[in-house]
Design a protein with these regions (language model features):
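Gly/Ser-rich "nucleophile elbow"/oxyanion-hole loop immediately N-terminal to the catalytic nucleophile
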Residues: 108-114, 183-203, 223-226
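Gly/Ala-rich beta-loop-alpha elbow adjacent to hydrolase catalytic centers
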Residues: 204-208, 212
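Alpha/beta-hydrolase active-site loop
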Residues: 167-190
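Catalytic-loop region of hydrolases
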Residues: 1-112
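Short beta-strand/loop motif that positions the catalytic acidic residue
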Residues: 346, 351-358
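Accessory cap/linker subdomain of secreted extracellular hydrolases
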Residues: 234-343
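Short, surface-exposed "cap/lid" segments of acyl-processing enzymes
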Residues: 95-103, 107-145
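C-terminal catalytic histidine-bearing segment of alpha/beta-hydrolase fold enzymes
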Residues: 326, 331-333, 337, 357-360, ...
């Protein structure tokens, strides 16, 4: 990529994607970025990893067996790379279907050709400082391989941080993600930065894993003119109702902030006429704006503020009663937004990753996906890969390896 001032007003005129900030990042600097590393719990005890005991082999088998170790391997892989980060704005729609301006980031190789686009649906975040347009996303390390990553913020972050995030509202979020792709592609073509190939990768973990499958559905079901080379989906809540129901059935939430965030996302994103104060404990409902909607706190900080993993400490009797009118309506919305309820079978090849030790998104989600899509072209990678956070880092490490192998195969020198 030749150096271009993408923030130049002449380029912004009639542009589909308006760049608001541009910088070149030396990825070696990330190892010294304490705040960035802290978001990945690098100061905490390494997450559980039983790769050796499970006999994990293949691309998902990093040589390290700790969160810090695999993070270091990812950073070492990318350390000689410089990336061009473009934060910007594009047009999409809001929860009412009305026009709105959303934000996101494009990460390009600072020099050399662009091979393909990777359209990334990001994992669950809570604070606005974690929004892709405000930070270097972990998936951005894949820029080392010559790919350009397109990473939307979603409604509720970046340019729309004052809005409630419609968490796991699949069709809307898939539309928002695709709208950024449609905005970025002509913009970069106009700037002389078109990729060498016109097929793309889709990628996402956790919330992003389910969202990236919804993006694939939106492309294939509606015959969008986008060629998908491969989809990488990891740790996704493909069955939202089942995922939420586990909080109620077991009376335990290892990731307690997910309870109010999922409830609010369904209510706001689906425009449900439900009084959340009847379902949430008063101290949560009264602090929902301050703790969640302010976007000032990370998920870990919100978990600390909530002070309990016991679901009945978070929800009222009505909220815990799956037969109540309120919860029944909530569950209907969750079913309607679950990708597994769609009358659709993925066409493009998919790599689906899920840790059997996942403590946030139950592994059963992946098993239900495997049962639902038994006739699809899906490669499943299940194993004891550690908890949800560890699974995320291992997933990105695995995608890196798969992309390297894909490149070798494309160049005719792939070896098994």
């Amino acid at each position: 990529v030749q150096y271009v001032d993408f923030t130049d007003l002449a380029m912004a005129e009639n542009a589909t994607f308006r760049v608001t900030a541009q910088k070149t990042t030396d990825l070696r600097e990330l190892t010294n970025d304490a705040e960035w590393l802290a978001l990945w719990g690098m100061a905490d005890t390494p997450a559980m990893d039983t790769a050796n005991a499970a006999g994990i082999t293949g691309p998902q088998r990093a040589s390290s067996t700790t969160l810090a170790g695999i993070m270091q391997e990812l950073l070492d892989f990318s350390k000689s790379t410089k990336a061009l980060e473009l934060s910007g704005l594009y047009k999409s729609i809001d929860v009412d279907g009305q026009p709105t301006i959303l934000s996101g980031k494009v990460i390009l190789p600072a020099k050399g050709p662009i091979k393909r686009y990777i359209l990334v649906s990001h994992y669950t975040i809570a604070s606005n400082k974690e929004a892709p347009s405000n930070i270097f996303s972990l998936e951005g390390l894949l820029v080392k391989l010559g790919y350009a990553l397109i990473i939307p913020d979603y409604i509720g972050y970046g340019a729309t941080a004052d809005k409630v995030h419609p968490y796991l509202v699949m069709e809307l979020t898939a539309t928002n993600v695709l709208d950024m792709y449609y905005a970025v592609v002509p913009f970069l073509e106009k700037a002389g930065c078109a990729p060498e190939h016109d097929d793309i990768y889709l990628m996402g973990y956790s919330q992003g894993g389910a969202t990236t499958m919804a993006v694939q559905h939106a492309i294939e079901h509606h015959d969008k003119p986008i060629k998908i080379r491969r989809v990488f989906a990891g740790g996704g809540p493909y069955d939202i109702k089942y995922t939420y129901d586990q909080f109620v059935e077991t009376n335990w939430a290892s990731y307690p902030c997910a309870v109010p965030i999922m409830m609010q996302g369904m209510v706001v994103g689906n425009k449900l006429d439900l009084d959340m104060s009847k379902m949430m404990q008063p101290f949560i409902y009264e602090n929902l704006d301050a703790w969640v909607n302010s976007k000032l706190y990370t998920a870990g900080q919100i978990n600390t503020l909530l002070g309990s993993h016991v679901t009945s400490d978070l929800l009222t009797e009505i909220g815990m009663d799956r037969t109540s009118k309120e919860v029944s309506e909530l569950y209907k919305a969750m079913v309607n937004n679950s990708i597994l309820t769609y009358s659709w079978t993925p066409k493009a090849p998919v790599f689906m990753f899920h840790s059997m030790d996942d403590d946030v998104v139950p592994f059963e989600n992946a098993m239900r996906a495997k049962s639902k899509w038994k006739n699809a072209n899906i490669q499943y990678s299940f194993g004891h890969f550690g908890n949800h956070q560890m699974g995320c880092v291992r997933f990105i490490y695995t995608v890196q390896t798969l992309l390297e192998n894909d490149e070798k195969e494309e160049n005719g020198n792939f070896t098994f």
